[in-house]
Protein backbone atom coordinates (compact mmCIF):
# COMPACT_ATOMS: atom_id res chain seq x y z
CA UNK A 1 0.00 0.00 0.00
CA UNK A 2 1.29 3.46 -0.90
CA UNK A 3 1.99 5.93 1.90
CA UNK A 4 1.42 9.57 0.92
CA UNK A 5 2.25 12.72 2.89
CA UNK A 6 -0.14 15.67 2.57
CA UNK A 7 1.58 18.97 3.37
CA UNK A 8 -0.79 21.92 3.66
CA UNK A 9 0.24 25.55 3.23
CA UNK A 10 -3.09 27.40 3.05
CA UNK A 11 -4.41 28.95 -0.15
CA UNK A 12 -7.93 29.17 -1.54
CA UNK A 13 -8.42 25.41 -1.23
CA UNK A 14 -8.33 25.74 2.58
CA UNK A 15 -10.13 29.09 2.80
CA UNK A 16 -13.36 30.14 4.43
CA UNK A 17 -15.34 33.38 4.14
CA UNK A 18 -14.50 36.07 6.70
CA UNK A 19 -15.49 39.71 7.10
CA UNK A 20 -12.39 40.59 5.09
CA UNK A 21 -12.90 38.00 2.35
CA UNK A 22 -11.56 34.49 2.00
CA UNK A 23 -8.89 33.44 4.48
CA UNK A 24 -6.99 30.10 4.70
CA UNK A 25 -8.36 29.01 8.07
CA UNK A 26 -8.82 25.27 7.52
CA UNK A 27 -6.16 22.95 8.92
CA UNK A 28 -4.92 19.84 7.17
CA UNK A 29 -6.97 17.32 9.12
CA UNK A 30 -10.13 19.30 8.42
CA UNK A 31 -9.20 19.48 4.74
CA UNK A 32 -8.52 15.74 4.58
CA UNK A 33 -11.92 14.93 6.10
CA UNK A 34 -13.49 16.57 3.06
CA UNK A 35 -11.68 14.33 0.58
CA UNK A 36 -14.01 11.35 0.05
CA UNK A 37 -11.61 9.26 -2.04
CA UNK A 38 -8.96 8.87 0.67
CA UNK A 39 -9.60 5.14 0.89
CA UNK A 40 -7.73 1.89 1.29
CA UNK A 41 -5.77 2.56 -1.91
CA UNK A 42 -3.14 4.40 0.13
CA UNK A 43 -2.55 5.74 3.61
CA UNK A 44 -2.24 9.48 4.16
CA UNK A 45 -0.36 11.40 6.82
CA UNK A 46 -1.29 15.08 7.14
CA UNK A 47 1.07 17.82 8.25
CA UNK A 48 0.34 21.55 8.38
CA UNK A 49 3.33 23.73 7.64
CA UNK A 50 1.74 27.09 6.71
CA UNK A 51 -1.63 28.87 6.74
CA UNK A 52 -1.04 31.57 4.14
CA UNK A 53 -2.67 33.21 1.18
CA UNK A 54 -0.09 32.30 -1.44
CA UNK A 55 0.30 35.94 -2.48
CA UNK A 56 2.12 36.29 0.86
CA UNK A 57 4.56 33.43 0.21
CA UNK A 58 8.16 34.64 0.48
CA UNK A 59 11.54 32.92 -0.08
CA UNK A 60 11.56 31.97 3.60
CA UNK A 61 8.42 29.90 3.01
CA UNK A 62 9.99 28.23 -0.03
CA UNK A 63 12.86 27.19 2.22
CA UNK A 64 10.45 25.85 4.84
CA UNK A 65 8.52 23.80 2.27
CA UNK A 66 11.71 22.46 0.67
CA UNK A 67 13.15 21.43 4.03
CA UNK A 68 9.90 19.70 4.99
CA UNK A 69 9.86 17.72 1.73
CA UNK A 70 13.54 16.87 2.03
CA UNK A 71 13.18 15.67 5.63
CA UNK A 72 10.24 13.40 4.77
CA UNK A 73 11.35 12.08 1.36
CA UNK A 74 12.52 8.68 2.59
CA UNK A 75 9.37 7.88 4.57
CA UNK A 76 6.75 8.23 1.83
CA UNK A 77 5.98 7.06 -1.68
CA UNK A 78 4.89 10.56 -2.67
CA UNK A 79 4.10 14.00 -1.28
CA UNK A 80 1.12 16.24 -2.10
CA UNK A 81 1.45 19.94 -1.26
CA UNK A 82 -1.72 22.04 -1.18
CA UNK A 83 -0.95 25.64 -2.12
CA UNK A 84 -2.64 28.81 -3.31
CA UNK A 85 -2.71 29.35 -7.05
CA UNK A 86 -1.26 32.88 -7.15
CA UNK A 87 2.31 31.70 -6.56
CA UNK A 88 2.01 27.94 -7.04
CA UNK A 89 4.01 27.97 -10.28
CA UNK A 90 6.81 29.96 -8.62
CA UNK A 91 6.93 27.56 -5.68
CA UNK A 92 6.94 24.53 -7.98
CA UNK A 93 9.78 25.96 -10.04
CA UNK A 94 11.87 26.88 -7.00
CA UNK A 95 11.34 23.45 -5.43
CA UNK A 96 12.43 21.82 -8.68
CA UNK A 97 15.85 23.41 -8.26
CA UNK A 98 16.05 23.22 -4.46
CA UNK A 99 15.26 19.48 -4.48
CA UNK A 100 17.33 18.24 -7.42
CA UNK A 101 17.27 14.46 -7.55
CA UNK A 102 14.16 14.07 -5.38
CA UNK A 103 13.40 10.34 -5.71
CA UNK A 104 9.62 10.52 -5.28
CA UNK A 105 6.74 12.53 -6.79
CA UNK A 106 6.18 15.92 -5.13
CA UNK A 107 2.88 17.26 -6.44
CA UNK A 108 1.55 20.76 -5.86
CA UNK A 109 -2.15 21.40 -6.23
CA UNK A 110 -4.87 23.75 -5.08
CA UNK A 111 -8.13 25.15 -6.35
CA UNK A 112 -9.86 28.21 -7.70
CA UNK A 113 -12.77 27.72 -5.27
CA UNK A 114 -12.54 26.60 -1.61
CA UNK A 115 -13.05 22.92 -0.91
CA UNK A 116 -16.30 23.71 0.94
CA UNK A 117 -17.78 25.59 -2.03
CA UNK A 118 -20.51 23.55 -3.79
CA UNK A 119 -18.86 24.07 -7.20
CA UNK A 120 -15.29 23.54 -6.02
CA UNK A 121 -12.59 22.20 -8.32
CA UNK A 122 -10.58 21.10 -5.29
CA UNK A 123 -11.63 17.45 -5.24
CA UNK A 124 -10.82 16.83 -8.90
CA UNK A 125 -7.43 18.50 -8.52
CA UNK A 126 -6.66 16.53 -5.37
CA UNK A 127 -7.67 13.29 -7.07
CA UNK A 128 -5.14 13.95 -9.85
CA UNK A 129 -2.48 15.01 -7.36
CA UNK A 130 -2.83 11.84 -5.28
CA UNK A 131 -2.80 9.67 -8.40
CA UNK A 132 0.43 11.35 -9.50
CA UNK A 133 1.89 11.03 -6.00
CA UNK A 134 1.27 7.27 -6.18
CA UNK A 135 2.82 6.93 -9.64
CA UNK A 136 6.47 6.59 -8.66
CA UNK A 137 7.46 9.30 -11.17
CA UNK A 138 10.24 11.27 -9.49
CA UNK A 139 10.21 15.07 -9.65
CA UNK A 140 8.24 18.17 -8.75
CA UNK A 141 4.91 18.65 -10.53
CA UNK A 142 1.75 20.78 -10.63
CA UNK A 143 -1.56 18.89 -10.89
CA UNK A 144 -4.50 21.04 -11.92
CA UNK A 145 -7.62 20.71 -14.06
CA UNK A 146 -6.94 17.24 -15.45
CA UNK A 147 -3.31 18.04 -16.27
CA UNK A 148 0.06 17.29 -14.70
CA UNK A 149 2.80 19.79 -15.52
CA UNK A 150 6.52 19.64 -14.81
CA UNK A 151 7.08 22.05 -11.93
CA UNK A 152 9.69 24.21 -13.63
CA UNK A 153 7.45 24.60 -16.72
CA UNK A 154 4.16 25.55 -15.06
CA UNK A 155 2.71 29.03 -15.53
CA UNK A 156 -0.59 30.42 -14.30
CA UNK A 157 -2.18 32.01 -17.36
CA UNK A 158 -5.83 32.37 -16.29
CA UNK A 159 -6.83 34.15 -13.11
CA UNK A 160 -10.27 32.66 -12.47
CA UNK A 161 -10.78 29.75 -14.87
CA UNK A 162 -10.45 26.21 -13.56
CA UNK A 163 -8.03 25.65 -16.45
CA UNK A 164 -5.57 28.04 -14.82
CA UNK A 165 -2.16 26.55 -15.67
CA UNK A 166 -0.26 25.72 -18.82
CA UNK A 167 3.04 24.00 -19.55
CA UNK A 168 5.50 26.32 -21.30
CA UNK A 169 7.77 24.82 -23.98
CA UNK A 170 7.36 21.32 -22.56
CA UNK A 171 4.78 18.58 -23.12
CA UNK A 172 2.35 17.68 -20.38
CA UNK A 173 3.66 15.09 -17.96
CA UNK A 174 0.17 13.68 -17.55
CA UNK A 175 -3.45 14.11 -18.52
CA UNK A 176 -6.69 12.65 -17.25
CA UNK A 177 -9.59 11.13 -19.15
CA UNK A 178 -12.30 8.61 -18.31
CA UNK A 179 -9.63 5.94 -18.02
CA UNK A 180 -7.71 7.83 -15.35
CA UNK A 181 -4.27 9.43 -15.27
CA UNK A 182 -1.99 8.81 -18.25
CA UNK A 183 1.68 9.69 -17.77
CA UNK A 184 3.91 10.73 -20.65
CA UNK A 185 7.21 9.11 -19.64
CA UNK A 186 9.12 11.13 -22.24
CA UNK A 187 8.16 14.35 -20.44
CA UNK A 188 9.47 13.26 -17.03
CA UNK A 189 12.70 14.81 -15.75
CA UNK A 190 15.76 12.54 -16.09
CA UNK A 191 16.73 10.64 -12.96
CA UNK A 192 20.07 11.75 -11.58
CA UNK A 193 21.02 8.41 -10.06
CA UNK A 194 22.26 9.98 -6.82
CA UNK A 195 20.52 11.00 -3.63
CA UNK A 196 18.54 14.20 -3.44
CA UNK A 197 20.60 17.23 -2.46
CA UNK A 198 18.83 20.09 -0.69
CA UNK A 199 19.89 23.49 -2.01
CA UNK A 200 18.28 25.66 0.63
CA UNK A 201 20.23 28.87 0.05
CA UNK A 202 18.41 31.10 -2.42
CA UNK A 203 20.79 34.07 -2.49
What are these regions (language model features)?
Residues 10-11, 80, 129, 146:
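Buried hydrophobic positions in well-ordered alpha/beta secondary-structure cores of metabolic enzymes
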Residues 15-16, 87-92, 122-126:
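Short glycine/serine/threonine-rich phosphate/pyrophosphate-binding segments
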Residues 73-78:
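Short acidic/histidine-rich motifs immediately flanking catalytic phosphotransfer sites
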Residues 108-178:
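Internal gly/pro-rich beta-alpha loop/helix module
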